UniProtKB/Swiss-Prot annotation:
This is Ribosomal RNA large subunit methyltransferase H. Its EC number is 2.1.1.177. The gene is rlmH. It comes from Burkholderia ambifaria (strain ATCC BAA-244 / DSM 16087 / CCUG 44356 / LMG 19182 / AMMD). Its main location: cytoplasm. It catalyses: pseudouridine(1915) in 23S rRNA + S-adenosyl-L-methionine = N(3)-methylpseudouridine(1915) in 23S rRNA + S-adenosyl-L-homocysteine + H(+). Specifically methylates the pseudouridine at position 1915 (m3Psi1915) in 23S rRNA. S-adenosyl-L-methionine binds at L73, G104, I123, S124, S125, M126, T127, L128. Keywords: Cytoplasm, Methyltransferase, rRNA processing, S-adenosyl-L-methionine, Transferase. Belongs to the RNA methyltransferase RlmH family. Homodimer. Pfam families: CPT, SPOUT_MTase.
Amino acid sequence: MKLFILAVGHKMPGWIASGFDEYTKRMPPELRIELREIKPELRSGGRSADSVMAAERQKIEAALPKGARIVALDERGRDWTTMQLAQALPGWQQDGRDVAFVIGGADGLDPELKARADVLLRISSMTLPHGMVRVLLAEQLYRAWSITQNHPYHRA
């Protein structure tokens, strides 16, 4: 199983890439994280948010690994604790499907993509910069894995 993070956005600051890389390099070979950046659509020429999200959805769908479990990050998603994420990981590994975490663009994710998702997950009740979400998600995936391995990284 492989973990994918599909994120609408590009040209993140160096500190975002550095933070993201720090956690992805800690992951074991059987749980590698791959980032797939999706170029955001321009909101020029009077385009509506709906048309932008629909165009971004098409790009996201083209980048999704075939048969992957989709975890869409959304402000109206379910709140999971780190322990709940840690409990989900082994089951996901056992079923063998790749897992794709999807971070939308500035306008969010298209409703069709959210409806198709296996899980709608809220990473925070606060509004966060999309680059920061990449780092937080990578850290939480590493922490969840460390919990499943009784690794000392997580001390609770």
